[in-house]
Amino acid sequence: MTFAGAALSGVIPAIARADPVGHQVTYTVTTTSDLMANIRYMSADPPSMAAFNADSSKYMITLHTPIAGGQPLVYTATLANPSQWAIVTASGGLRVNPEFHCEIVVDGQVVVSQDGGSGVQCSTRPW
């Protein structure tokens, strides 16, 4: 892209290419035991923390789903600002520690990986 014509005319050109709609975010949850898990993950960017707090269900998916030990559950989302909003949590109610593991991958790069006992949280910032 050249700006020579814009400099001569004194007009700033419009951006020639649109920025990507967002970043591809992949959330992965695994456990060592078969169980019913409670999983929550951010599926859309809230416009603000106040909007999220007012109605988190508009932005965060909540699932009660079976998970088999060693078999990953994978969820994807497109987020404009994953460094602000990417989060996945998982928990289960077993007497035996299910040893949860979670991971967040943004645009093909692992950005967070955590292990937990009866629950785990991966996020790109403190909540």
Q: Where do the language-model regions lie?
A:
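Sec-dependent N-terminal signal peptides
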Residues: M1-G5
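Mature extracytoplasmic domains of secretory-pathway proteins
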Residues: M42-R95
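Short loop/turn segments at connectors of secondary-structure elements within structured domains
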Residues: I12, V21, L35, V96-P98
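C-terminal region of N-terminal signal peptides and the immediate post-cleavage residues
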Residues: A6-Q24
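Short, surface-exposed binding/anchoring microloops in extracellular/periplasmic proteins
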Residues: D19-N53
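Extracytosolic low-complexity repeat regions of secreted or lipid-anchored proteins
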Residues: P72-T124
